[in-house]
Amino acid sequence: MTSPPHTLEAETGPDPVASIIVMHGLGADGSDFAPFVAEIDLRPIGPVRWLFPNAPQQPVTINGGYVMPAWFDIRHDRGDEDEAGLRRSQAAIEALLAHEKARGMPAHRIVLGGFSQGCAMALLTGLRHTERLAGIVGMSGYLPLAGTLAAERSAANADVPIFLAHGTQDEMVALPRATASRDALQALGYGVDWHAYPMGHSVCMEEVGDLRGWLLNVLAP
């Protein structure tokens, strides 16, 4: 049985009413998005549990085989996706979702999100999850294994709210790849809240503000 990844946690108060999972990008770790706890004020909905899972250490082909935190391998040919690695991490995130539900947080109060590789994992896992989630957040990433989604997607999350954000000058995941992912999701009937910002492969405060508003909406009691 797959174990959940080692995960950093922060609760903004006792008895949290929602859980927000944020997965980091290539070469980072769970602490990368810990500032969200202070930057995104969700007090209007009540206490929240933030979870920041750590990707496993593995060689990354496009970086010369250097071992670093990665949810999956990235090869030189963008079309050659590491399906085995993606599926392994999908299973680990499913285990994390199961752990959250086992300690009393219903799926409809869980937001699954991530940045770059973490965005890919949020879309891969969330759209196939068998129980309705509160929402999916994708920052500066793309839709992986897009060709399998129509057959594998979960009816429970057919109408899940999706927040997608991207930098117009992103040098790591080019904007057209992100807009193609958005268009593919919309073609399958998903409702996508799309945001583009004048930045590179990063997060800006305007984006954080927009994300806060979106979270307050999808997690409203």
Write out the residue ranges for each language-model feature.
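Short, proline-enriched alpha-helix->beta-strand connector loops that line the catalytic pocket
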Residues: 17, 157-162, 188-191
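C-terminal catalytic histidine-bearing segment of alpha/beta-hydrolase fold enzymes
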Residues: 176-221
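Short beta-strand/loop motif that positions the catalytic acidic residue
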Residues: 164-166, 170
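Serine-hydrolase catalytic machinery in alpha/beta-hydrolase-like enzymes
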Residues: 1-111
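Primarily recognizes the serine-hydrolase "nucleophile elbow" in alpha/beta-hydrolase
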Residues: 106-157
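Short, conserved loop/helix-junction motifs that constitute active-site signature segments
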Residues: 42-45, 153-159
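Short alpha-helix in the alpha/beta-hydrolase fold that links the catalytic acid
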Residues: 33-38, 150, 174-184
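Alpha/beta-hydrolase-fold catalytic nucleophile elbow
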Residues: 53-54, 113, 137-140, 165, ...
